[in-house]
């Protein structure tokens, strides 16, 4: 109970209670209650600050609500565009510069989230690189086998240092379960020998470099299609670190040595290799989560050029082509893709080239791939087609772009990236045009093999999502089956390149550059058919698009917190237009449309139409009013031809002794307009009393005259009537009329005379005489003449009852008259005119000038003014303050009119009574 009692007190009361309390436990409870009150006050202030932050835009500013909504939509669109830009930016320095230049809080929040994302990717990539390096000693058997393969393929080569031999190989460890979360895509291009050639030995499981890729699933192709001959040279390739050193060119490897190496038997085509089994096993057990493949959907601009290059004349390949010892990726790709020097001499060899089997290859990811085998080309030609030349040129452009990636300097740090690759990655986020027309073949690496080169080559492109991976090209030379593998650490969406035995190349793009592919979307295959050297025909390019879906835009914030999709499908109904809304003349129809419409733009149009309609109606009413006024002014004769009726009644009464004579004169003027719409009635009653006093030889007479005027006007066009009367003696009643000063003086003189007469005569006799004269006048008016004077007399008797508005106005007039001439006083109402207390002080000072010095008062000191006026009125005229000083201070600039009117009315009664007492004493 004590705690509840303390909870009901405010902080001041608690502190006073703390001062007078001696018990320690009680003082502790009081302090706890004070702290709780302070905490609640802080919470309320924080809530008030939080609610005021956007109040001007969203809540209080009702007039600019549409503008604030539009501004908010623009801000959301700008944030969405910034999120798209940040998704394609992967440089921490560039993001930091953008963060320093950003001024908005929401933009800075998005940029910080993007910086955290990039740093997390770099840390993840560095961790993976550390795991790979920790497994370095386990690759000893591979090193020995690959060194043997290098010496076998190039017997005349000088042995290189041990360090370079370790750099030449690529460590492909078995992936751990935690490694499978990274987006890694390996695209394998497999070249197999034709049926007539001698097969090579199968690859051992630990010699297969593709076993480290858990995602692609390659089916054995030997049972489904005839194998083809490899188009590449079997010479070993040096490491990229040897690129800057100029060394003499090396002669091509003789075909005899090549045949000597490849003379190992190969199992039947229906037997799958151990490598394919290992790949299948990893892909079946360790599938990547489809939700984690979004980051792998960025495009590689090197593999999808913007515009097709013009065809070039075929280059003569008759001369001996010598490979230099250069470590660039361009030379390595040319070794795999360019024609061998023996091609020109052996045109009659078996059919050349293939890059992979036509069997469908499944790639996990957000897209579903369907591969359609193309029909064999039936056209034969002895000369190369322009498509061949264009394809070779695209191969050279691809190699040149990859060489630029390798030749660029690396960034600092363990996970350095090439500068060119970084620019490509930063540009990959934006939309790029991807040509899918039949006239623009994709850049597929197509080459022709050598006769007798019965080796098979695997061209592998690993596309990893790790940021810290070094983008270096490496050549793997396994021992068992002489498979050459080129791995490029490039970031790109998954791309499948395959070629069947009949010379058909197939390229499949899983996602277009710069777009976000939704889960479950299907991308059909783009088939590019290329004939073999023995069967050189035209170029077929076929694209099978998806059925059209309603376009949708996916916006993903940089921090990955929220994702909004805006469907841009065609609307079911046509949008409203401003012309249709302008044609509607009914406000009710527009109001119903506004209630039923949910689209923001349409609601804005409907509101604009409502405003225009209301403005038109207002203009129409104003024009009609002006027209009626002009018509009234155009008929001045009619306005003067009003019918006026005036009735005058005079009644005199004389006492029996002749000492008192009373006269009552009543004049009634009734004016009717010509059309009968307006009526004005004026009644004037003049009472005159004369008394003669005779004292011996001298006689004197006193005359008192009272004039009372009542006016009443009515109009049949409106139901309201205007009544004019007075129950107060107002000093400024005739101040606005012409000659107001003379009339005011005359009236004041009459009032003084009447007051003196009333005080000198017995009150009973005067009141009785007045009542008797009025009764006689009414009787005479009702007895003679038509009924109009009778009605006028009845109206005049009931006219003296005022309404509330007239009472307030007359009280304001009395206060204004009493405070005329006082500084800082302007009485116009019962609210703001009395807010500073100067009007109260002026009203009291007018009756009691000696009570206080009005000149010392100031409107700024409101409390002193209220205390001075209220205390003086209570002390001098016994007027109890019906309103407190604290209430007036709390109400501020606009106090309650009812409170002020009640107190002013009480003040009027007391001051008026005091004034009458003063007049009685003076008389």
UniProtKB/Swiss-Prot annotation:
Residues 134-456, 542-578, 615-772 are annotated as: Disordered. Residues 237-252 have a biased composition (Pro residues). The modification N-acetylalanine is found at residue 2. Residues 164-179, 192-205, 366-389, 697-721 have a biased composition (Low complexity). Residues 805-912 form the Calponin-homology (CH) domain. It comes from the Eukaryota. One of its GO terms (biological process) is negative regulation of systemic arterial blood pressure. Keywords: Acetylation, Coiled coil, Cytoplasm, Cytoskeleton, Phosphoprotein. Residues 615-638, 744-756 have a biased composition (Basic and acidic residues). SUPFAM superfamilies: Calponin-homology domain, CH-domain. The modification Phosphoserine is found at residues 299, 301, 304, 340, 501, 521, 574, 641, 735, 798. GO terms for cellular component: cytoplasm; cytoskeleton. Structural protein of the cytoskeleton. This is Smoothelin. It comes from Mus musculus. The lineage of its organism: Eukaryota, Metazoa, Chordata, Craniata, Vertebrata. The gene is Smtn.
């Amino acid at each position: 109970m004590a705690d509840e009692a303390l909870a009901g007190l405010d902080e001041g009361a608690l502190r006073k209670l703390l001062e007078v309390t001696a018990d320690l436990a009680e003082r502790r409870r009081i302090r706890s209650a004070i702290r709780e009150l302070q905490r609640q006050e802080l919470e309320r202030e924080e809530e008030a600050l939080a609610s005021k932050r956007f109040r001007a835009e969203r809540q209080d500013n009702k007039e600019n609500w549409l503008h604030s909504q539009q501004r908010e939509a623009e801000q959301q669109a700008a944030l969405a565009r910034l999120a798209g830009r940040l998704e394609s930016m992967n440089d921490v320095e560039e993001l930091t510069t953008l963060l320093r230049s950003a001024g908005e809080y929401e933009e800075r929040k998005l940029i910080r989230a993007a910086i955290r994302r990039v740093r997390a990717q770099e840390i993840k990539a560095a961790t993976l690189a550390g795991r790979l390096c920790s497994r370095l000693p386990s690759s000893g058997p591979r090193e020995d086998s690959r060194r043997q393969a290098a010496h076998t393929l190039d017997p005349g080569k000088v042995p290189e240092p041990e360090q370079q031999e370790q750099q030449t190989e690529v460590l492909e460890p078995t992936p751990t379960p935690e490694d499978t979360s990274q987006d890694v895509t390996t695209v394998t291009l497999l070249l197999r020998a034709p049926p007539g050639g001698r097969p090579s030995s199968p690859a051992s499981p630990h010699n297969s470099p593709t076993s480290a890729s858990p995602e692609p699933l390659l089916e054995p192709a030997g049972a489904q299609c005839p194998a083809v001959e490899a188009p590449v040279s079997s010479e070993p390739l040096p490491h990229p670190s040897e690129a800057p050193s100029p060394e003499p060119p090396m002669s091509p490897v003789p075909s005899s040595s090549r045949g000597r190496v490849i003379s190992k038997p190969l199992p039947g085509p229906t037997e799958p290799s151990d490598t394919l089994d290992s790949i299948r096993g990893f892909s079946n057990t360790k599938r990547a989560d489809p939700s984690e493949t979004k980051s792998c959907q960025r495009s590689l601009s090197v593999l999808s050029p913007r515009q097709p290059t013009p065809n070039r004349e075929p280059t003569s390949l008759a001369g001996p082509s010598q490979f230099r010892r250069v470590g660039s990726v361009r030379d390595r790709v040319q070794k795999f893709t360019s024609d061998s020097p023996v091609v020109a001499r052996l045109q009659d060899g078996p059919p050349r080239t293939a890059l992979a089997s036509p069997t469908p290859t499944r790639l996990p990811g957000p897209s579903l791939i369907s591969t359609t085998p193309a029909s064999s080309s039936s056209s034969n030609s002895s000369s190369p087609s322009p498509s061949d030349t264009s394809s070779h040129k695209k191969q050279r452009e691809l190699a040149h772009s990859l060489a630029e990636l390798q030749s660029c300097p690396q960034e600092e740090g363990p996970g350095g990236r090439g500068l060119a690759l970084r620019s490509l990655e930063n540009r990959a986020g934006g939309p790029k045009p991807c040509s899918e027309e039949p006239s623009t073949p994709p850049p597929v690496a197509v080459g022709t093999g050598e006769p007798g080169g019965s080796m098979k080559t695997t061209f592998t492109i690993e596309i990893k999502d790790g940021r810290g991976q070094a983008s270096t090209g490496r050549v793997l030379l396994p021992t068992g089956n002489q498979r050459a593998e080129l791995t490029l650490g490039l970031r790109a969406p998954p791309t499948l390149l395959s070629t069947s035995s009949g010379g058909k190349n197939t390229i499949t793009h899983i996602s277009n550059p710069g777009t976000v592919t939704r889960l479950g979307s299907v991308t059909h295959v783009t088939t590019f058919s290329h004939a073999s050297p023995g069967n050189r025909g035209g170029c077929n390019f076929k694209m099978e698009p998806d059925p059209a879906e309603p376009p949708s835009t996916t916006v993903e914030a940089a921090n990955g917190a929220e994702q909004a999709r805006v469907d841009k499908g065609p609307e079911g109904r046509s949008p409203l237009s401003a012309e249709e809304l302008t044609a509607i003349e009914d406000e009710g129809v527009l109001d119903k449309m506004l209630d039923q419409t949910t689209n923001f733009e349409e609601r804005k149009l409907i509101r604009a139409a409502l405003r225009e309609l209301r403005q038109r109606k207002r203009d129409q009413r104003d024009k009609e009013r002006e027209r009626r006024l002009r018509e009234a002014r155009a008929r001045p004769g009619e306005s003067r031809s009003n019918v006026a009726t005036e009735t005058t009644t005079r009644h005199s009464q004389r006492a029996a002794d002749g000492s008192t004579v009373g006269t009552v004169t009543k004049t009634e003027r009734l004016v009717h307009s010509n059309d009968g719409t307006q009526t004005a009635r004026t009644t004037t009653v003049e009472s005159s009393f004369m008394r003669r006093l005779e004292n011996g030889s001298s006689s004197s007479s006193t005359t008192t005259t009272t004039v009372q005027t009542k006016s009443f006007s009515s109009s049949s066009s409106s139901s309201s009537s205007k009544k004019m009367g007075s129950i107060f003696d107002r000093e400024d009643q005739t101040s606005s009329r012409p000659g107001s000063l003379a009339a005011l003086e005359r009236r004041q003189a009459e009032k003084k005379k009447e007051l003196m007469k009333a005080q000198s005569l017995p009150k009973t006799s005067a009141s009785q005489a007045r009542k008797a004269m009025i009764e006689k006048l009414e009787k005479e008016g009702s007895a003679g003449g038509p009924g109009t004077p009778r009605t006028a007399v009845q109206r005049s008797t009931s006219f003296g009852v005022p309404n509330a508005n007239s009472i307030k106005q007359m009280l304001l007039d009395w206060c204004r008259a009493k405070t005329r001439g006082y500084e800082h006083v302007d009485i116009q109402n019962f609210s703001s005119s009395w807010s500073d207390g100067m009007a109260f002080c002026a009203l009291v000072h007018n009756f009691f000038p000696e009570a206080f010095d009005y000149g010392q008062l100031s409107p700024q000191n409101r409390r002193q003014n209220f205390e001075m006026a209220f205390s003086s009125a209570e002390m001098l005229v016994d007027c109890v303050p019906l309103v407190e000083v604290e209430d007036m201070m709390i109400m501020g600039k606009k106090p309650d009119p009812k409170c002020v009117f009640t107190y002013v009315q009480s003040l009027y009664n007391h001051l008026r009574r005091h004034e009458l007492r003063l007049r009685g004493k003076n008389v």
